[in-house]
Amino acid sequence: MITCSMITNIILTSQQHNCLVSLAKDSLPNESCALLVGNHNGKETFVLDLIPMKNSDASIISFSIAPQELIDAYQTVEKQGMEVVGIFHSHPAQPLPSSVDKKFMQINPVVWIIYSTITNEAKAYIFEEKIEEVQLRVTTA
């Protein structure tokens, strides 16, 4: 397993990016969330599939995923021979990790993509000893 400190890029297709933006906008005024499924190749993380998840908080300022829904998703991903490489969620503010995000980033050491429904900008982050920005690349393929 690759550690977060080795990851410098996360790569999405434009179609995947558009799906995440649509998920965020369709979930308004609440935050949205999804799991990013894929694999790693050296310092790059490739997203191959998206699993939209229900925000069980149904909140405009937070998200959570029901434990059983999360377990089911991880089992499905594992059966496909892939792994959860990231977590996506939207913010009603700047695309920056909140203090709550920081806490959960420590527990879930994957890339976190945060999309701002205000600025329509997405940024990616990892947490090791501190939060670091990861380059988010959107490809046309």
Give the positions of each predicted feature.
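Conserved beta-strand-loop surface patch within small alpha/beta domains used
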Residues: 2-84, 92-141
